[in-house]
Structure formats: structure tokens, C-alpha cells
UniProtKB/Swiss-Prot annotation:
Domain Lipoyl-binding residue range list: 24-106
Subunit structure: The glycine cleavage system is composed of four proteins: P, T, L and H.
Cofactor(s) annotated in UniProt: (R)-lipoate
Name of protein: Glycine cleavage system H protein
HAMAP family: GcvH
UniProt KW keywords: Lipoyl
GO cellular component, one term: glycine cleavage complex
GO biological processes: glycine decarboxylation via glycine cleavage system
Family the UniProt entry places it in: Belongs to the GcvH family.
Transmembrane segment boundaries: none
Cofactor binding note: Binds 1 lipoyl cofactor covalently.
InterPro entries: 2-oxoA_DH_lipoyl-BS, Biotin_lipoyl, GCV_H, GCV_H/Fam206, GCV_H_sub, Single_hybrid_motif
Phylogenetic placement of the source organism: Bacteria, Bacillati, Cyanobacteriota, Cyanophyceae, Synechococcales
Annotated positions of the N6-lipoyllysine modification: K65
Organism: Prochlorococcus marinus (strain NATL2A)
Amino acid sequence: MAFSFPDHFRFADSHEYAFADDSLVRIGISEFAVDQLGDIVFVDLPEEGTAIAKGESFGSVESVKAVEDMYAPVSGEIVHRNNSVLASPEELQNDPHGEGWLLIIRPDNPAQLKELMDSETYSKKISA
């Protein structure tokens, strides 16, 4: 399967994406990660107001194959979580880069985005 990643996305080694959305950062998991997981049946996300730290687990996604932790690509405070994905995990399955986003955070250090892979580098990584 060929994957397409938006140019403005930045990616962590653990397959989470992040991108600046005004002064906030939107976080999700890549289409590649969703494909590897298979049918997603459950998503667990922290409450709004929770602080997350870059590289630390912030929730999990459960599929028919496995339960995988998700890791924060940047540090910050959760200002919004996608409750639609919690109620209907298939939204993550069907549109991970759009309606299937997971969190919006107020970043502690927006420069952390620059430490993540750009779309081209991430595409090469998953193709290797």
C-alpha cells in the first residue's frame, strides 16, 4: 500500500504525527501505523488539562492484533481531545490524518516540532 503524508506534518520514530495549528499542535498517529495495527476497536486518551511529555506514553490504541502505547511527539498541555474517536474508533481507522486526529495541545516548546522527521524522511523510513 502506498502512503501519502501531508507536507506540513512532522513525525516521531514511534509513528505519531504533529503539526502546528496556529499556536497549538495537533497530534495523531500515521496512516502507516493504522495500517499496521489493522482493525481498531478501542482508543484511550487522557483528559483535557493533562500535561504530556515528549517521548512519554499518552494513551493507547487497541486493535484486533495488539494494544500499542502512543508516545507524545512534543510536550504540552492537552486543550482538546477528539471524543469522536473515543466513541467511534473507526474514525481513526478511516481518516487518521483528518477526522481521526487524537489531541490538540498547547506546546511547552514549539521548537520540538523541528526535531521530528518531515514527511519525506518519514516516508523513506517506513519504506526501508
